[in-house]
């Protein structure tokens, strides 16, 4: 996601 963390940094990486 946007600022969701480690797993989501493949998509956004904040």
Swiss-Prot record:
The keyword NADP belongs to this UniProt entry's keyword annotation: no
Organism superkingdom: Eukaryota
Family, per entry: To insects allatotropin.
Keywords on record: Amidation, Neuropeptide
GO molecular function, one term: neuropeptide hormone activity
GO terms under cellular component: extracellular region
Residues with PTM Phenylalanine amide: 14
Function text: Has a stimulative effect on the contraction of gut muscles.
Organism, as annotated: Eisenia fetida (Red wiggler worm)
GO annotation terms (biological process): neuropeptide signaling pathway
Keyword Transferase appears in the UniProt entry: no
Name recorded for this polypeptide: Myoactive tetradecapeptide
Disulfide-linked positions: none
